[in-house]
């Protein structure tokens, strides 16, 4: 897999503990390798105002959130498929980590894993089996990356 699978757009001020581009690439590339996917995604780091506007426009929820995943709906190319966009609010991720007494890096990893799984077709809306399936995968990847289970 080449290194041209991730396009990162930074539209916010970066915090001291925002992961490096290499860290984002490592997490996402590892997930793709696990699923034997050769794909591309866009990762956009934004301010609260932008993610709130996107959440309202696309999900009809009038509040900011930590991450939004926008899967791409178009025919797959045999060589490379574009999975979609992840939009993350750095400020919210870092505040959540602090409020939940988690390391900022492990929470970032969890959020990126969660969003990438959404782009791969995993969902957790109103189905306990789907929620459990997604959480098991999140925990598996977090453990692989050296982080603890975020649900305990």
Swiss-Prot record:
Pfam families: YbeY. Disulfide bonds: none annotated. It is found in: Cytoplasm. Its cofactor is Zn(2+). InterPro entries: MetalPrtase_cat_dom_sf_prd, YbeY, YbeY_CS. Binds 1 zinc ion. One of its GO terms (biological process) is rRNA processing. Keywords: Cytoplasm, Endonuclease, Hydrolase, Metal-binding, Nuclease, Ribosome biogenesis, rRNA processing, Zinc. It comes from the Bacteria. Single strand-specific metallo-endoribonuclease involved in late-stage 70S ribosome quality control and in maturation of the 3' terminus of the 16S rRNA. This is Endoribonuclease YbeY.
